[in-house]
A protein has these predicted regions:
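Conserved class I S-adenosyl-L-methionine
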Residues: 55-65
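Active-site capping/gating segments
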Residues: 156-199
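Conserved SAM-binding motif I beta-strand of class I
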Residues: 80-85
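S-adenosyl-L-methionine
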Residues: 22-57, 87-121
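Conserved beta-strand signature within the Rossmann-like core of class I S-adenosyl-L-methionine
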Residues: 147-159
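Central antiparallel beta-sheet cores of small beta-barrel/beta-sandwich binding domains
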Residues: 190-260, 264-272
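Glycine-rich SAM-binding Motif I of class I
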Residues: 67-71
Length: 287
């Protein structure tokens, strides 16, 4: 890829600030944009815990190295998973490690370009990549099913701020001056920008929303007798759920349910809206 030289330069800078040459556990560059640097075992465990991985989850690890994240997810948490790795020797090692751990039926590994991987089945995606790669992946990650959890080791995703960040001691970390790791969690937000229209009895309602990642703003309008009463909304999106707040209190709780927004919670003067469903206006206006 055209970004190969820039990525190699970045990693070289990181490594030379800590050790002369590659440390133990870090593999030299091959036909890949991202080097293999081992994630310490305790960091692997904390990544899975941060994503709240469980038996119903399907974990995809991008740049899976020796397979430890997918294997640990299967062994300790009962999840199924796929490791995507471009280096064939690491894929062979990962499959051998899965067999040795007794989880080969739930942990599989594939030699594949991570940018060409179908991520749609994942409920959790883990990655230890590089900043530029994270940013290149970001559009595909934002397009995933709302509620998909993403955990990145050390690197963020630019102006898409994480929902949670934790710092974990990592005395066995092979690179970096600080023997700690920062783990970032994102929950993929529903894509809700636009005009939504609904009706309850003889009254019609609309919600017009704008969105910046997991934050939203908008206006709720109640249309009565040709007049519109408006109320501003602002809040946060967690997966398919929007929480519009009034100070510290929840004013409206709205859920994206298929192709409709459904008000599942309403407080104060808006309590009559509970149960209202609204659909996105196809032509940019409510009929």
């Amino acid at each position: 890829m055209n970004s190969m030289r820039r990525l190699q330069t970045l990693v070289a800078v990181l490594l030379t600030t800590t050790l002369m040459g590659l440390p133990a556990g870090a593999q030299p560059f091959g036909d890949t944009d991202v080097p293999f640097v081992i994630t310490p075992d305790n960091v692997t465990l904390e990544m899975l815990k941060l994503a709240k991985v469980g038996p119903k989850d399907y974990v995809i690890d991008l740049g899976s190295g020796d397979g430890r994240i997918v294997i640990e997810g299967a062994r300790r948490f009962g999840a199924r998973g796929l490791g995507v790795e471009i280096m064939p020797d690491l894929v062979r090692l990962s499959n051998a490690n899965a067999r040795a751990a007794g989880v080969a039926d739930r942990a599989t590994f594939r030699e594949q370009d991570l940018f060409k991987t179908d991520l749609s089945a994942a409920t959790v995606i883990t990655m230890y990549l590089l900043p530029e790669v994270n940013l290149q992946l970001r559009p595909a990650l934002l397009a995933l099913k709302p509620g998909t959890r993403l955990v990145s080791h050390d690197w963020d995703m630019g102006d898409w701020q994480p929902d949670q960040t934790v710092t974990v001691a990592a005395p066995d970390k092979p690179i970096g001056r600080e023997k700690s790791s920062r783990l970032h969690l994102w929950v993929v937000p529903a894509q809700i920008a636009g005009l939504w229209c609904g009706a309850a009895g003889l009254r019609s309602f609309s919600i017009e929303l704008t969105q910046s990642f997991q934050s939203f703003q908008g206006t709720l309008r109640r249309h009565v007798g040709g007049q519109a009463q408006a109320r501003d909304l602002a809040g946060r999106i967690t997966g398919p759920v929007l929480q519009a707040n009034n100070g510290s209190a929840a004013l409206l709780t709205i859920k994206l349910d298929g192709d409709a927004l459904r008000i599942i919670g309403a407080q104060s003067s808006l309590s009559a809206l509970r149960g209202l469903s609204l659909r996105r206006a196809a032509d940019g206006r409510c009929s």
